[in-house]
Amino acid sequence: MVHGYKGVQFQNWAKTYGCSPEVYYQPTSVEEVREVLALAREQKKKVKVVGGGHSPSDIACTDGFMIHMGKMNRVLQVDKEKKQITVEAGILLADLHPQLDEHGLAMSNLGAVSDVTVAGVIGSGTHNTGIKHGILATQVVALTLMTADGEVLECSESRNADVFQAARVHLGCLGIILTVTLQCVPQFHLQETSFPSTLKEVLDNLDSHLKRSEYFRFLWFPHTENVSIIYQDHTNKAPSSASNWFWDYAIGFYLLEFLLWTSTYLPCLVGWINRFFFWMLFNCKKESSNLSHKIFTYECRFKQHVQDWAIPREKTKEALLELKAMLEAHPKVVAHYPVEVRFTRGDDILLSPCFQRDSCYMNIIMYRPYGKDVPRLDYWLAYETIMKKFGGRPHWAKAHNCTQKDFEEMYPTFHKFCDIREKLDPTGMFLNSYLEKVFY
């Protein structure tokens, strides 16, 4: 019989959200997952699955049963001919990468963080950049899902296709993902080239940049005109690195954290900090190359609050200039660097922020120096207002203030997803306070 633990305290990576589940489970098999759900039905408990805990929101929180899938983390099958790999849903991407390397395979695109589970990555709509590439869930070709009553559904474009269309971005509310089959590509290396520019230049030449680099993104430094452009493209060059402990850590982390903490008492310093660190760290061309997963991912050093919305790609310039104008018109509203701007191909996944449109993701951030929260409400609300104006949809893993009414307007297939959810989980076993705001 599966054993649960009481008294476990859950906190997300940034320590911005947490909860105290009544019982915490770490199942090792499908049967143990089924046992937990049977107990939940019997005791009328809510159930939430947690992965790597990196979501900067309360999407995984519950005061009921919490299931951590970390012990269901095996590679089940590798099909070298089709270049597909089937894994248990609790495997971390950080553990999957070396196993893909062994087989000469890779994922075609990855987010910035690898200490996250496969099920969590797809369920939250995790993305990176590259207008020819979709969110990570578009790499899923099949999955298995256990519903609230313990039934296991095999889902793909040819089996339970309606559930598959919903479950690739499942929000943790359709059931428990057990296995995932990913479409991979041959192993490849990337060269990353970063160089300074201006906001005017990058916005005026956006189409050119998107054509020039397969994985293009840029960082805008609020309260300035400064931009760092980042290209990532296939290469045959030997691995090389531009990293340097003094600049990356002594300056880019320890000094920055101290100055950001100081700015909590003197907010007028934030604009100066953004300019200073652009000129210190981003004002010259840098190049590095390595295996793709080592270029796509990087170390997130700062605890932080973030928002990340997807707007239609053609609205990028207008929306970013409006955000800039808002900050200029309200000098008491301060914004940490960077505003990270990325691009993603449209898809047909029911609750994908990129549903039926190529998208621009505009990520804003406020750091928590030494764990201290920085006033951000005015910045957050102004940003959300601008994103809604331009047809934005929020990243599911990141905090937002949207409700059911908003999502009905944002997603033409919202009610179709709701119908599937209610069919698979008629009692709402997999709901929590975050999801109740979404669906009710």
Swiss-Prot record:
The gene is Gulo. Keywords: Ascorbate biosynthesis, Endoplasmic reticulum, FAD, Flavoprotein, Membrane, Microsome, Oxidoreductase, Transmembrane, Transmembrane helix. It is found in: Microsome membrane; Endoplasmic reticulum membrane. Belongs to the oxygen-dependent FAD-linked oxidoreductase family. Oxidizes L-gulono-1,4-lactone to hydrogen peroxide and L-xylo-hexulonolactone which spontaneously isomerizes to L-ascorbate. This is L-gulonolactone oxidase. Its EC number is 1.1.3.8. It catalyses: L-gulono-1,4-lactone + O2 = L-ascorbate + H2O2 + H(+). It comes from the Eukaryota. The modification Pros-8alpha-FAD histidine is found at H54. GO terms for cellular component: endoplasmic reticulum membrane.
